[in-house]
Amino acid sequence: KLPSLRRAINEPGRKLLLATKTWEPLKYSDTKSTNGKLTTYPSGEVHASGTFPANTRYDLTAASQDFTAFRVTIIPETENIAALPERGSVLSTLSLHKIKADGAKEKINLSYVFADQVAGTFDPVGSIGNGHDGFGGYPKLFGKRQAVFIPAAPVTFAKDEKLEITMQHRSSTTGGQACTVRRFTIDTSNNTAWTQLLSNPDHAKNVATHNQALNQYNQIKGTNIPVIRERSEHATRETRIFLGGLWLNKGEVQQPGVPKLLNGYQNKVDTRLEMAHWITSPENPLTARVMANRLSSDMFGRGIVETLGD
């Protein structure tokens, strides 16, 4: 129930993210990092280089531009799609401040986060809090990720004011390998539809229902165990042939289905569950042949086909 509720809350924002075509990239006047180095490019991209331990923080200063939505795009380091996935990349906490002309800072309150997809162990909404969640790809980054941060009210700037962006990283994988954001863009939109999204009664209702269900879940005592669950259609991952069985050497992209050699009638099979039903069907001779070969091996010491895995 919780995953479906979370996706229902995110869906209007996901659709608006796809529909919003006009975004204005930030123009940086200063970029700092507690570790390593940040480099900006005319395209608006920011690249991180060097050594980045956990808890690395980025502090960026940009020229002011009014906005109703603040988009962060995490981009894989590699240009070769077949080489993905790569090391995880997670924005743990994002905070924004106005820098007044006299140097004083005013916090910009962020109300919600909508993402291109909601899947995995981290909730993107956690990136505007102080928890251990965040937005990005964890423990691996499988492709470009996008999230839109919505302020509590449209943000406007006076003359000579600037925008300060703080990006905090806390996530790490086994061995203490930090999952910092290493290549990204930040841009803004002044589309009022983003503000209207938060004022929609359905949004508030769905958030309240989700929070109530989450509180009930957290009150259940017991041991957490992993559960396999099919990813939503917007969060599916690319599947490729491993050439020679080597995962580092990838071939063509593959679509869900049954190998033609085993599916003479070319029945449409789109999911693993359907394939399991197909394999175990009483009408499928493959299952009987495998079983007969296993029984032969157990009873006579050798199967009809000696290598049982073939």
Give, region by region, the residue ranges found by the protein language model.
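Short coil-to-beta strand junction motifs in C2/discoidin
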Residues: 65-67, 78-93, 176-184
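Short, functional "switch" segments adjacent to catalytic/cofactor/reactive centers
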Residues: 1-44, 49, 115-116, 120-130, ...
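Short, surface-exposed tryptophan/glycine-enriched loops
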Residues: 59-62, 121-160
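Extended low-complexity, serine/threonine- and proline-enriched intrinsically disordered segments
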Residues: 87-119, 126, 184-188
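Short beta-strand-plus-loop segments that form exposed binding edges in beta-rich domains
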Residues: 74-78, 166-178
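Extracellular beta-rich ligand/substrate-recognition surface
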Residues: 46-55, 135-145, 264-269
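Extracellular polysaccharide-targeting segments
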Residues: 187-212
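Extended extracellular/luminal ectodomain segments enriched in beta-structured repeat modules
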Residues: 55, 64-71, 157-164
